[in-house]
């Protein structure tokens, strides 16, 4: 068992080690994330997790969430990867803008994540309900040993909430939780069954508590002794903010790509 799971909790209580059972066959690990310009972190993720992850679903859009043009550049980078990594990648190119437009940045962001989840699942074949769906942003990398344990064992809840080690500008510069808003957990890992039943494969809902509103579905899970309360796992990976080459063009791209409606930025002022 990975050491990080020894202190994992559900509703504040640790799970007994006897809860976990070795599977007769491994389940598939599906890792999905949107991509913008973080080529270095993408390479780190792929090389670190390729031996555990069965499918990487990567979404690239030809427009930003602020509505500006965003040239598709990922395909030409992926061909340089070794085949044992490249063969595990499902690239989704998003070319249809959100129907609501870009005036509401949060809605535009939700449209991006919804497309990632639903279109990615639509293109997969032979999905099993106990497969594991891992949803992160492109600057977040879960620990390989955690995913390997989930791949090989049963006994954990239908979803996991991860606390990631946060750093800025590079993995070497970690943020002290005391000054970084405290220890934060985000829902990020779930069974395909949970993803289907509670979110209809809409990844924009993964980091919310919207599942708690579906009382009828929760009762169905309880009736068969299945837990939907997320298991919290501390220090379950890395979140490296602003970790890319310090070029002005990349900085401008980052700022203008993700600014929501309440935070409009003009490149003329940068």
Predicted feature descriptions by range:
Residues 140-269:
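Conserved catalytic core of nucleotide-sugar-dependent glycosyltransferases
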Residues 15, 20-26, 63-136, 143-148:
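Active-site-proximal specificity loops/subdomain of glycosyltransferases
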Residues 33-47, 51, 61-63:
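Active-site beta-to-alpha loop of glycosyltransferases that engages the nucleotide-sugar donor
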Residues 1-32, 270:
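Juxtamembrane luminal stem/stalk of type II transmembrane Golgi/ER carbohydrate-processing enzymes
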Residues 31-36, 59-60, 135-138, 162-165:
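Short His-Asn-centered micro-motif
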């Amino acid at each position: 068992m990975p050491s990080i799971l020894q202190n994992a909790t559900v509703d504040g209580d640790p799970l007994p080690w006897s809860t976990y059972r070795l599977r007769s066959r491994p389940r598939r690990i599906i890792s999905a994330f949107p991509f913008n310009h973080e080529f270095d972190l993408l390479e780190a993720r792929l090389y670190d997790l390729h031996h555990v992850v069965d499918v990487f679903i990567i979404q690239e859009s030809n427009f930003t969430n602020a509505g500006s043009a965003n040239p598709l550049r990922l395909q030409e980078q992926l061909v340089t990867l070794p085949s044992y990594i490249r063969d595990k990648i499902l690239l989704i190119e998003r070319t249809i803008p959100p129907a609501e437009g870009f005036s509401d940045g949060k809605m535009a962001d939700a449209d991006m994540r919804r497309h990632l989840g639903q279109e990615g699942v639509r293109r997969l074949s032979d999905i099993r309900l106990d497969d594991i769906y891992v949803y992160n942003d492109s600057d977040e990398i879960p620990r390989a040993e955690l995913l390997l344990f989930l791949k090989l064992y049963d006994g954990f809840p239908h979803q996991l909430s991860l606390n990631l080690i946060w750093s800025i500008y590079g993995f070497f510069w970690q943020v002290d939780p005391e000054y970084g808003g405290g220890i934060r957990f985000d829902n990020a890992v779930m069974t395909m069954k949970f993803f289907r039943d509670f979110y209809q494969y809409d990844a924009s809902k993964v980091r919310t508590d919207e599942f708690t509103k579906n009382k009828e579905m929760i009762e169905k899970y309880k009736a068969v002794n299945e837990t939907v309360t997320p298991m919290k796992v501390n220090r379950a990976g890395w979140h490296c903010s602003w970790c890319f080459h310090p070029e002005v063009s990349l900085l401008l791209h980052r700022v203008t790509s993700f600014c929501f409606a309440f935070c409009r930025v003009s490149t003329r002022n940068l």
